[in-house]
């Protein structure tokens, strides 16, 4: 199964693509969709949708795993939620089934406990995908963790 993991954001949307055929998980691709801070929010949403469409067309995921937004007080909360909405809409347009996970569930699935530190989750991602070097940037590594959670929780 090919799974696209998404770590939503406005400035950077992390993505990770894994393949689970043959009983092993392997990373196919990871990176970020970057938007320019000088652009309007609307233009940034267009960039996210456009780049995500390209990823979906290139990798043809059978499942998307998206991190659920964890609400807290921040000046960027609304923008991040809107960017996540663009991600969800784009996935729906391509009829990609979606599963969603809050950060605590991702940490639990990867590191064994919901309050794991970021480096513990990263180590688990590297172990599960048999990587010698950590995926970069952090948003891409987070997206791979989301994709793996999608596989483990199916």
UniProtKB/Swiss-Prot annotation:
Location of this chain's protein in the cell: Cytoplasm
* Residues annotated as catalytic: 7, 67, 139
- Name the residues that bind Mg(2+) 1: 7, 139
Query: Which Pfam families does the protein's record reference?
Result: RuvC
Give one GO term, molecular function aspect: crossover junction DNA endonuclease activity
Q: Where does Mg(2+) 2 bind?
A: 67
Function of the molecule: The RuvA-RuvB-RuvC complex processes Holliday junction (HJ) DNA during genetic recombination and DNA repair. Endonuclease that resolves HJ intermediates. Cleaves cruciform DNA by making single-stranded nicks across the HJ at symmetrical positions within the homologous arms, yielding a 5'-phosphate and a 3'-hydroxyl group; requires a central core of homology in the junction. The consensus cleavage sequence is 5'-(A/T)TT(C/G)-3'. Cleavage occurs on the 3'-side of the TT dinucleotide at the point of strand exchange.
- Put simply, this protein is called Crossover junction endodeoxyribonuclease RuvC
Q: Which organism is it from?
A: Synechococcus sp. (strain CC9902)
């Amino acid at each position: 199964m090919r799974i696209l993991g998404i770590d939503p954001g406005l400035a950077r949307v992390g993505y990770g693509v894994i393949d689970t055929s043959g009983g092993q998980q392997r990373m196919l691709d990871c990176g970020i969709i970057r938007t320019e801070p000088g652009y309007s929010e609307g233009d940034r949403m267009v960039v996210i949708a456009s780049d995500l469409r390209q990823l979906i067309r290139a990798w043809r995921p059978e499942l998307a795993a998206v991190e659920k937004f964890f609400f807290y007080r921040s000046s960027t909360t609304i923008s991040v939620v809107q960017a996540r909405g663009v991600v969800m809409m784009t996935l729906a347009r391509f009829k990609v089934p979606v599963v969603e996970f809050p950060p605590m569930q991702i940490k639990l699935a990867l590191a064994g406990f919901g309050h794991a530190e970021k480096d513990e989750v990263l180590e688990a991602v590297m172990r599960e995908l048999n990587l010698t070097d950590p995926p970069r940037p952090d948003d891409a590594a987070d997206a791979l963790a989301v994709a793996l959670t999608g596989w483990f929780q199916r």
